[in-house]
Amino acid sequence: MARYIFITGGVVSSLGKGLASAALGALLQARGYTVRLRKLDPYLNIDPGTMSPYQHGEVFVTDDGAETDLDLGHYERFTGRPALRDDNITTGRIYQEIIAKERRGDYLGATVQVIPHVTNAIKDFVLSGTDGVDFVLVEIGGTVGDIEGLPFFEAIRQLGNDLPRSHAIYIHLTLLPFIPSAGELKTKPTQHSVKELRSIGIQPHILLCRTDRTIPREERRKLGLFCNVRESAVIEARDVQSIYDVPRAYHAAGLDQEVLAAFGIEPAPKPDMSRWNAVMERVHNPEGEVTIAIVGKYTGLKDAYKSLIEALAHGGMANRINVRIDWIESEVFESDDPAVYLDHVHGILVPGGFGQRGAEGKILAARFARERKVPYFGICFGMQMAVIEAARSLAGVKDANSTEFGPTKEPVVGLMTEWMRGNELQIRAAESDLGGTMRLGAYRASLAPHSKIAAIYGATEISERHRHRYEVNTAYRERLAENGVIFAGLSPDGLLPETIELLDHPWFIGVQFHPELKSRPFEPHPLFASFIAAALEQSRLV
């Protein structure tokens, strides 16, 4: 039977519960255990698919087409285990399912209440699909004391009693702020956070304390005494240079050993940290550096591009170099010369996005890369803008545009209305709801045998994750090909363009999918490894 680890947070948000969960999962894997990680999100949205990136950050898409929290990206990157739709749930989705049951009469006339109906739905979610797994790590979003989170805290409290003894523990992540004027770390915020947690019936077994310095022995003793935990269970979570050093740091602090002790697992299997050591050797000893410009529209919040940032770092690891990112708001190119911002960079990446704002700036970035022979990587919207630029500048389609921006005489990019999901035909229309109506999840693509992208993958059949509502119009395929822009990848039925590449260019590739979602520190995605290698070559020319 699986053992359950519940990770909660206190004092302030954004302390890194997702990263802590992922790191602990990786440490348990290093000891030979199997893990599954899940995230409970207290907000009322069904999923983050329609939320602003500035509100929520990145939407992480799973193979089975779920739009989920960005923490699931951490889970995948650290453990290598693909996340699924059933690894993330929100209050909105729970309420939606409960109300649907009530309308069907499933509750047989009972009064539907938070306890037991909502809490039971949460418990059912946590316990489902865990056969054959040694540990299930469950992260609860938000901080203790949030009104939205109360049903989730009540549910995990009940689970602590429902499960057999020594099958559930609670880890509480808190902040130990350093007060310069006093010259010391303060434990009172953590004490109050634990007091709040205990008031709803949860006694943490382990405290994971975020800090930028060593926790003195006296402060550990104080936290153990007033928070009712063992002194050895007060774990120091120091800031580190790279997120990929977190597993090693937490192991050195004794987190995984304390978790196994809390479950009564002794003697504990010794961990194999060799692959984490190998990753960090590459991070700490780069043999060069390249600068990549990310030309986007959500550059004010880096979490909007979390998987992209990590995939570029993985590409750097593959080439043993450091990747420096220049963040550029695409709108500036609509009034300023792109050369001022791009002359010094070694590669240009235009990521996914939605809407007309900043689109012309992305088109200008693609033009700069094409004309100056700078490596260009267009992802999703970035591929579409590159095709529009090529249609206008190379194929003579002066009015080329996307129907996403309004009616156009030359719809080089248009709304997808039909596509196949396995054996099922998916149909969408302009008036469809925004939520859950995109082409989502993993789809296969066929690559042209002698194309650059097929050489990069070392294969002609691939599967990648998608999240888009618009597509490049195949009616323009021949005109573009005549001018050196080829559709190197198509859906298996040949109807949907998946990749484009420019023939007369050292590295100019656009993809309709999101390869960043499948990159891992131990297995850098081949497209990012190749893109960074091309940028390295460019750095020797500049």
Curated annotation (Swiss-Prot):
E.C. number(s) listed in UniProt: 6.3.4.2
Pathway membership, UniProt: Pyrimidine metabolism; CTP biosynthesis via de novo pathway; CTP from UDP: step 2/2
GO cellular component terms attached to this protein's record: cytosol
Catalytic site: 380 (nucleophile), 514, 516
UniProt binding sites for Mg(2+): 71, 139
Entry binding sites for L-glutamine: 54, 353, 381-384, 404, 469
Top-level enzyme category: ligase
InterPro entries in the cross-refs: Class_I_gatase-like, CTP_synthase, CTP_synthase_N, GATASE, GATase1_CTP_Synthase, P-loop_NTPase
Activity modulation comment: Allosterically activated by GTP, when glutamine is the substrate; GTP has no effect on the reaction when ammonia is the substrate. The allosteric effector GTP functions by stabilizing the protein conformation that binds the tetrahedral intermediate(s) formed during glutamine hydrolysis. Inhibited by the product CTP, via allosteric rather than competitive inhibition.
Region ranges (Amidoligase domain): 1-265
PROSITE patterns xrefs: GATASE_TYPE_1
Alphabetically ordered keywords of this record: ATP-binding, Glutamine amidotransferase, Ligase, Magnesium, Metal-binding, Nucleotide-binding, Pyrimidine biosynthesis
Subunit record text: Homotetramer.
Assigned protein family: Belongs to the CTP synthase family.
Protein name (database record): CTP synthase
Organism (species): Methylocella silvestris (strain DSM 15510 / CIP 108128 / LMG 27833 / NCIMB 13906 / BL2)
